[in-house]
Amino acid sequence: MAVSDLLNRRVRALPDEDEELYSEASVSELESNDEEVEGSGSDISDDSSEGDYSSDSQDESDAMSHENEEEDDEDDENSDDGQDDVQASLSNISFGALAKAQASLGPTAKRKSKATQSKTDDGETPAASPLDDIRARIREAREQKREGSSKSKDLEKFSRSSKHAPMVQSSKHPVTRKRTIIEPPAALKSRDPRFDPAVRSQSGRSEASQSAYAFLDDYRAAELKEMKEKLAKTKDPRQKEALKRDIRSATDRLRTIENRRREKEVLAEHKKREKELIREGKKSTPYFLKKSELKKQALLKKYESMGSRQRVKALERRQKKLTAKERKEMPMERRGLGNDPTPYNDGGGGKRRRLA
């Protein structure tokens, strides 16, 4: 019974870090307990060697067992007191001391690597898991990406050869992430119909635009009248020349507009006449006017609408214009009068003829 009690005795291992925290009394008690245990063990061995199973030895063993139980209770109480002392001492340690201790031990990754190295040194081969392989590949890919980005950044750093040289800039710009899903309405712009190409151009002057901007002709006529009145009142020669030039351009513009309107009227009458002839069966195909014939008919209509005196003046001006045009096309020898050797006796300029 005594041997089994000794083997079944509870023994607690104390931490190595807290050896200095134990008191001398506890150490002396532990030594005395060890000596008593050794003494009891020697007595038991002597009894077993002698082989005396007397009642006296049994009484002694029973007494020893009771003493051992009491010693175990005392050990438990001493261990509880030691743990309380450890907790109190840990609560009094400063954070600086803890930080120094952690720094001396090193980071967790290094400690783990050291632990794995010690295991490999001991001969234990760690089992390679697929997760570790995947993590290693991801780590390598990240490192390669970082190296490539650092190289590209180094290449993108441009520098000028001198301060007078133009700055070198990359033509690669990132595409904007913004998208125009709904186009905003265009801002209304004020426009002047006098300078609008849709109004001024011949192709854009449809019937709708003519009827919509018919009031511009009245404005142009009133503007021309005002310029003529200013020309009669002004005495400055520069202003007179400028007004004459403006009046000439305004009259030409009005004349052109009137001629176009007259040509359209002539063309509309001709189309109407041709349709009637086709409807009556006198013609199978319509006849389309040429530009020269259209101009002649428009000119005849213009002269018909004039008075007698206006018609005479217009015919005289037209005759002078045609003679000047023919004279320019005439050779130099035929321009003179009689046997006058001067080639410019008529006072008009013209083309010179090269001598062969």
Swiss-Prot record:
Record's compositionally biased regions (Polar residues): 200-209
A biological-process GO annotation: maturation of SSU-rRNA from tricistronic rRNA transcript (SSU-rRNA, 5.8S rRNA, LSU-rRNA)
Positions in coiled-coil regions: 238-280
Biased composition, class Basic and acidic residues, residue ranges: 132-159, 313-337
Superkingdom of the source species: Eukaryota
Amino-acid biosynthesis listed as a keyword: no
Location(s) in or outside the cell: Nucleus, Nucleolus
Region annotation Disordered: where it falls in the sequence: 14-209, 305-356
This protein's UniProt keywords: Coiled coil, Nucleus, Ribonucleoprotein, Ribosome biogenesis, rRNA processing
Primary residence: nucleus
One GO CC term on file: nucleolus
Compositionally biased spans, kind Acidic residues: 31-50, 57-84
Role: Component of the 90S pre-ribosome involved in the maturation of rRNAs. Required for early cleavages of the pre-RNAs in the 40S ribosomal subunit maturation pathway.
Family membership noted in the UniProt record: Belongs to the RRP36 family.
Subunit-structure text: Associates with 90S and pre-40S pre-ribosomal particles.
Protein name: rRNA biogenesis protein rrp36
